[in-house]
Amino acid sequence: MRWLTVTLVTVILALQWPLWFGKGSWLRVWQLDKQLQEQRATTQKLVARNAALDAEVRDLKQGSDAIEERARNELGMIRNGEVFFQLLDPSKNPSRASHR
């Protein structure tokens, strides 16, 4: 009887081993599922980024307002006859504010 029990336990363990630790085991499935979720999150971020870039490209191709806005904000350009005023916040530049 003892021999039969040992044999059955051994057979059960031999059958369960690939299920838990083999190539297609539950652990591997769990790892792949986690990796898939991370990939989906990354893909979602990239899709949102691509949509924003696509909208910006379409805006630059179709309208001059976007080009003018970028020229003003990024390059500091102004139109003829305009005067540019730059107001500095004294609380953000303590070294200049302390000299007054």
Swiss-Prot record:
This is Cell division protein FtsB. PANTHER family: CELL DIVISION PROTEIN FTSB. The chain crosses the membrane at residues 4-21. Essential cell division protein. May link together the upstream cell division proteins, which are predominantly cytoplasmic, with the downstream cell division proteins, which are predominantly periplasmic. Residues 49-73 form a coiled coil. InterPro entries: Cell_div_FtsB, FtsL/DivIC. Keywords: Cell cycle, Cell division, Cell inner membrane, Cell membrane, Coiled coil, Membrane, Transmembrane, Transmembrane helix. One of its GO terms (biological process) is FtsZ-dependent cytokinesis. Residues 1-3 are cytoplasmic. It is found in: Cell inner membrane. The gene is ftsB. Belongs to the FtsB family. Part of a complex composed of FtsB, FtsL and FtsQ. It is a single-pass type II membrane protein. It comes from Chromobacterium violaceum (strain ATCC 12472 / DSM 30191 / JCM 1249 / CCUG 213 / NBRC 12614 / NCIMB 9131 / NCTC 9757 / MK). GO terms for cellular component: cell division site; cell septum; plasma membrane. It comes from the Bacteria. The keyword Membrane applies.
